[in-house]
């Protein structure tokens, strides 16, 4: 479960065109793999008229088709369903078994809330509207996919599963590599970063007592955990998170160990279920080409 988190003169690439051009090779290779299950997608029409625009946008952007592509390298023993749905006013995304079928639901309310909170322009920290959109969307989807992975493969999880799903999502985004991973990670952290920035100068942050009983970490904890794993994975690419004070040096010192432990867990428990060659093909797709490419214009404020 996930709680919500320049314009170029030559915008040559929309997400819809990206999917249309990139889907063919991985799909063909996937048919040759030994996996039995596939990823099924569905866009439910919203009952709430105020969500019709969001529905139209995600359909035009082929948002779920993109998710099917980025997760195609997993050998699934059964079908996994990813649905965009109306959630009765609640901005959310979650995994559960619907009639015993593993299902990820991404609420139109959540997608609408992400769009509404995007920065109007590139932030002082260099986060573009596209990065904030793509990073948050992919992080949320990968978080829920992490829950699906734990369930479908019956993987043991020590500690809170929500923390494990966050770590899975962070690791997944890092696999895009280098500058692409940097852009996705800072985009994913945008919602948490915005919250932390608004409260960082306060001597105390007041939270309702119930926040400490939640199966989710607080926004501050989730932000620091995310950037710590990223910094631990590549201290050079993510050096700015320490230089700018986003990650305290006291925590930064142990991040390489946190990432190392996470990588070992992923390689031991998850990697045996992944078609590595297909994964390399998917991760090599130029998700951010050209460098100034953005999400479709109608997704941005």
Question: Residue locations for each model-derived region?
Answer:
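Pan-zinc metallopeptidase signature
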Residues: 33-41, 206-301
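An active-site-proximal "capping" alpha-helix that borders the catalytic cofactor pocket
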Residues: 158-177
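C-terminal segment of classical bacterial N-terminal signal peptides
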Residues: 19-27
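Second-shell loop/turn segments in exported
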Residues: 49-57, 91-94, 127-136, 148-161
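Acidic/histidine-rich, surface-exposed loop or edge segments in extracytoplasmic proteins
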Residues: 34-55, 150-153, 168
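Active-site recognition of the HExxH zinc-binding catalytic motif
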Residues: 139-152, 166, 170
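Auxiliary, metal-adjacent structural segments of Zn-dependent hydrolase domains
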Residues: 56-122, 130-135
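Bacterial N-terminal signal peptides that target proteins for export
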Residues: 2-15
